[in-house]
From Swiss-Prot:
CDD domains: ACD_sHsps-like
Domain sHSP: 124-238
Name of the protein in question: Small heat shock protein, chloroplastic
Biased composition regions of type Low complexity, renumbered to the chain: 58-75
Name of encoding gene: HSP21
PANTHER family in UniProt: 26.5 KDA HEAT SHOCK PROTEIN, MITOCHONDRIAL (PTHR46733), HEAT SHOCK PROTEIN 21, CHLOROPLASTIC (PTHR46733:SF4)
Domain of life assignment: Eukaryota
A Gene Ontology cellular-component term: chloroplast
Amino acid sequence: MAAANAPFALVSRLSPAARLPIRAWRAARPAPLSTGGRTRPLSVASAAQENRDNSVDVQVSQAQNAGNQQGNAVQRRPRRAGFDISPFGLVDPMSPMRTMRQMLDTMDRLFDDAVGFPTRRSPAARARRRMPWDIMEDEKEVKMRFDMPGLSREEVRVMVEDDALVIRGEHKKEAGEGQGEGGDGWWKERSVSSYDMRLALPDECDKSQVRAELKNGVLLVSVPKRETERKVIDVQVQ
């Protein structure tokens, strides 16, 4: 094959004395893929942020058993969303109690990560993603919200033990009793939703005036603060 007709040109920068006699060169190019004249960009997935344990000690467990028929049981794992925030274990996952200050700090971090820049939890930031719990604090009271879908007022219990706010709830449901596929058995679906949380209240909160209200599966808790008088003592300088 002549050098002028070769699909690729070969350039040698060696001296004439060091060149080896080359009789013929052949260049093989791969066959083009049938992409229809379009090029597909290469998408590179960047590493996600560290899996921070930014959540409250609200233990929610749901178990569903559908079918007691013979055969192998397959357990499906729940899908993880792109912005997966679990409401369990805020700082130390082994600690059974969380403080209200930790919850406030966690809410600030969660909303800062969601919008990408520091914020004070504006209404626009809240509209982007609804968290399963929320807490707000002002000079008069502390307001908390916990999502408890499917639970009635009789199934939720709120109490104050010493300096801790305890929230517990459990809902059991049985449905779908009937004949299974092929008529070889009966099946029944059971679901259980359970909530158990202990939250340490600060000293300035009035534990005897805690109010709780459940509306449409949302628990609203209000903890008023005591009015503290500042005492000023003049210290004589000698």
